[in-house]
Curated annotation (Swiss-Prot):
<dbReference type="GO" id="GO:0005524">
    <property type="term" value="F:ATP binding"/>
</dbReference>
<keyword id="KW-0648">Protein biosynthesis</keyword>
<protein>
    <recommendedName>
        <fullName>Glycine--tRNA ligase beta subunit</fullName>
        <ecNumber>6.1.1.14</ecNumber>
    </recommendedName>
</protein>
<dbReference type="Pfam" id="PF02092">
    <property type="entry name" value="tRNA_synt_2f"/>
</dbReference>
<comment type="subunit">
    <text>Tetramer of two alpha and two beta subunits.</text>
</comment>
<dbReference type="GO" id="GO:0004820">
    <property type="term" value="F:glycine-tRNA ligase activity"/>
</dbReference>
<dbReference type="GO" id="GO:0006426">
    <property type="term" value="P:glycyl-tRNA aminoacylation"/>
</dbReference>
<dbReference type="InterPro" id="IPR008909">
    <property type="entry name" value="DALR_anticod-bd"/>
</dbReference>
<dbReference type="InterPro" id="IPR006194">
    <property type="entry name" value="Gly-tRNA-synth_heterodimer"/>
</dbReference>
<keyword id="KW-0030">Aminoacyl-tRNA synthetase</keyword>
<keyword id="KW-0547">Nucleotide-binding</keyword>
<dbReference type="GO" id="GO:0006420">
    <property type="term" value="P:arginyl-tRNA aminoacylation"/>
</dbReference>
<keyword id="KW-0436">Ligase</keyword>
<keyword id="KW-0067">ATP-binding</keyword>
<dbReference type="GO" id="GO:0004814">
    <property type="term" value="F:arginine-tRNA ligase activity"/>
</dbReference>
<keyword id="KW-0963">Cytoplasm</keyword>
<dbReference type="GO" id="GO:0005829">
    <property type="term" value="C:cytosol"/>
</dbReference>
Length: 715
């Protein structure tokens, strides 16, 4: 069996840059998976994906020319159906074999296999392995069909009649097994061994790939194309760093921009340009956004992190004299920066406060009213949170920042660059002479914007950020706009995680239930909360709605904690109690982990689970106190005394926030708990004894589950 390395390439017109890497990896993965499912790979097969602006390709090592032959066992029917009492084939078996074209097979050649319900007849067949050409044709069809393309193009083949649907028109197809061309076809093309190099950097129109292993090297040396996405990306990164270092500056790190530029060039060339220093009077975030978003440039910073007037260009050609390219890019960026300066100067002619009435003309959501109404809601809630977390001074700062937080949405700069919302609000607030605390709170109320983002810097910013996120959540919940599956158009999961992170990482002594309750109260008091429930309106705030939102928060918290490395049992143990103060959760989790390491932990967790099951099935009255005089069995007396001895210390440790000690104290209960369940019948026929023992178990459960529900740790 001949084994060689395999190469597949689709030569296309320019592919969508933002999805190029994803397309390349998906194309390669489906080809490999399809070949593997047809036994056309080996244990030594290694996949390498290629993706450049005009090509998708995959290289696979150790691919056989034909799949190995296989013995396939085909289940026919139960023996009782296929053979009669004398062991002769029944008409049903004859009919089945005839349908398979195997009517000449002797019944004695059939294999008998005992399965769970009956003994079955199997027909073993030798199946010849599929040839690579046929298997690769199927793999190509699978890859083309499964490629994750959001929008496809429709174009006609050269015959002018047949339409083809694909992400971009395809002009070439390579399929090489070593040096041999595999005659697969797709898009009206039959595979060959020729491709094309760079559009402008090479003279020859076609490049012959003489072996699957020489694809990347030939393209790079003779075609002026670096086909590997990761290699091209590393080349660009190193070039940017070297160019910046040469002038003692630092290039802004932006992985998204780096990916996009990597998808735009085939053979990158790093050039440096500059713009007039007058533009540096504009906030550097505006200039950076202009350069990155509009022009795909990489801005350069000085050692203090301040923007300079120099920038790096990743060109797709390498001319002898780069001056024309640089001057052309400088001319374009001057126009772009002039626009940014105009926006900045024009915006400052109006105060943020003067823009507030215009927010009433901007729709927030057709069922929730305007941005002006939303702003007043957030303002009220921020003021309440400020009082809960501080004093009237903090409440006043939160009120002012919340009032102005959305005003920059109406500025020209944010209209051009929406990602600058909040940031421009800070600049304009400082320009008006506002206190730095208010200015930073305006910017920070959007934080955290994404996973791993920094949190608000001040308490005022925290108050407004919490209010803004809670408003979004409860308002959208009130109109039934909940996330479903992987769809979350309003980023409600991100908003919930933002609230969770702020409460935990800022160690805020305020309960989640309190925040949700206050948010619900404000929504109910606002005009939107008073509208009739029905199409086009928010529903009234009900206890069910509040409970639904609380469940959503704890679900997001559980997922986040598991992502941080906590086990499902640890997370369930803590969150099953629904602790309101989220800032305590890390300490509770640490205590649970320490408790689980104790030798007594497994036994106590199992006992706690048993206690829970008994109490769940029993009609116990939580108001019934333990009657010491009613304790009869020595084991229940011992348990009662042991519980009484540790109860005070456990409660004190819990109140002091020493959760590790509060749980480790429980270790003393192992022996008396084990003895109790070995020697005492809880559901005694005597009602007084039964009620007393249930009361003892309730007290035991309350003590054991103060920090966490340790029954969740049971195996």
């Amino acid at each position: 069996m001949m084994i060689e390395n395999l190469l597949i390439e689709l030569l296309t017109e320019e592919l969508p840059p933002k999805s190029l890497d994803k397309l390349g990896n998906a194309f390669a993965a489906v080809i490999a998976d399809s070949l593997k499912s047809q036994n056309l790979t080996t244990p030594d097969t290694i996949l390498t994906a290629f993706a450049s602006p005009r090509r998708l390709a995959v290289h696979l090592t150790a691919i056989p020319a034909q799949a190995p032959d296989q013995v396939v066992a085909l289940k026919l029917m139960p023996i009782t159906v296929g053979l009669d009492a004398q062991g002769q084939p029944t008409p049903a078996l004859h009919k089945k074999l005839a349908a398979l074209g195997m009517e000449n097979v002797d019944a004695s050649a059939l294999k008998r296999v005992q399965e769970s319900k009956a003994e079955m007849l199997f027909l073993e067949q030798n199946v010849t392995g599929i040839l690579l050409a046929a298997g690769l044709q199927k793999a190509m069809e699978d890859a083309i069909r499964q490629l994750p393309v959001s929008k496809v193009m429709t174009y006609q083949l050269d015959d002018g009649w047949e339409n083809v649907h694909f992400v971009r028109p395809v002009h070439g197809l390579i399929a090489l097994h070593g040096q041999k061309i595999i005659p697969v076809s797709a898009f009206g093309l039959t595979a060959g061994n020729t491709t094309r190099g760079h559009r402008f950097e090479v003279k020859q129109t076609e490049l012959i790939i003489d072996h699957a292993d020489r694809y990347a090297s030939l393209l790079e040396t003779e075609g002026a194309v670096i086909p590997g996405f990761d290699r091209r990306r590393s080349w660009i990164r190193e070039g940017l760093e070297a160019a910046a270092s040469a002038v003692q500056l630092r290039c802004i790190s932006d992985e998204v921009l780096l990916d996009e530029v990597t998808a735009l060039v085939e053979y990158p060339n790093i050039l440096m340009g500059a713009f007039p220093t007058d533009f540096l009077e504009v906030p550097q975030e505006c200039l950076i956004s202009t350069m990155k978003i509009n022009q795909k440039y990489f801005p350069l910073l000085d050692t203090d992190g301040k923007l300079t007037n120099q920038f790096l260009i990743v060109a797709n050609i390498t001319p002898a004299d780069p001056g024309q390219i640089i001057s052309g890019n400088e001319r374009v960026i001057r126009s772009r920066l002039a626009d940014a300066k105009f926006f900045f100067d024009h915006d400052r002619k109006r105060t943020l406060a003067s823009r507030l009435p215009d927010l009433d003309k901007v729709i927030y959501h057709h069922q929730l009213g305007s941005q002006g109404e939303r702003t007043r809601y957030v303002q009220t809630l921020a003021r309440i949170i400020g009082r809960l977390l501080g004093d009237d001074n903090l409440a006043g700062q939160a009120d002012q920042a919340a009032m102005l937080a959305k005003a920059d949405l109406l500025t020209d700069m944010v209209g051009e660059f929406p990602e600058l919302q909040g940031i421009m609000g800070r600049y304009y607030a400082r320009f008006e002479g506002m206190d730095e605390t208010i200015a930073f709170a305006i910017e920070d109320h959007y934080k955290p914007r994404f996973a791993g983002d920094v949190l608000p810097r001040s308490m005022a910013g925290i108050c407004v950020a919490l209010a803004d996120k809670l408003e979004t959540l409860i308002s959208l919940f009130s109109i039934g706009q909940l996330p479903t599956g992987d769809k979350d158009p309003y980023a409600l999961r991100r908003h919930a995680l933002g609230v969770i992170r702020i409460l935990i990482e800022k160690n805020l002594p305020i309960g989640l239930d309190v925040l949700i309750s206050r948010a619900a109260d404000v929504l109910q008091d606002e005009m939107i909360g008073k509208q009739d429930s029905g199409p086009g309106h928010a529903r009234p705030v009900t206890p069910q709605l509040v409970g639904q939102l609380q469940d959503f928060f704890y679900d997001r918290l559980a997922a986040s904690l598991r992502d941080q490395g906590y086990t499902a049992q640890e997370v369930e143990a803590v969150l099953n109690l629904r602790p309101s103060l989220l800032c305590e959760i890390p300490r509770r989790l640490a205590a649970v982990r320490a408790f689980a390491a104790l030798p007594e932990a497994a036994s106590l967790a199992a006992a706690n689970k048993r206690v829970g099951n008994i109490l769940k099935k029993s009609e116990c009255d939580a108001t019934v106190a333990i009657d010491e005089a009613c304790l009869q069995a020595s084991a229940e007396i011992t348990l009662y005394r042991a519980l009484s001895e540790i109860e005070s210390d456990a409660r004190q440790a819990f109140q002091n926030g020493d959760y590790v000690t509060a749980l480790q104290i429980l270790a003393a209960l192992k022996a008396p708990v084990d003895a109790f369940f070995d020697q005492v019948m809880v559901n005694d026929e005597n009602e007084a004894l039964r009620r007393n023992r249930l009361a003892l178990l309730m007290a035991l459960q309350a003590t054991m589950n103060r920090v966490a529900d340790i029954s969740r740790l049971a195996a």
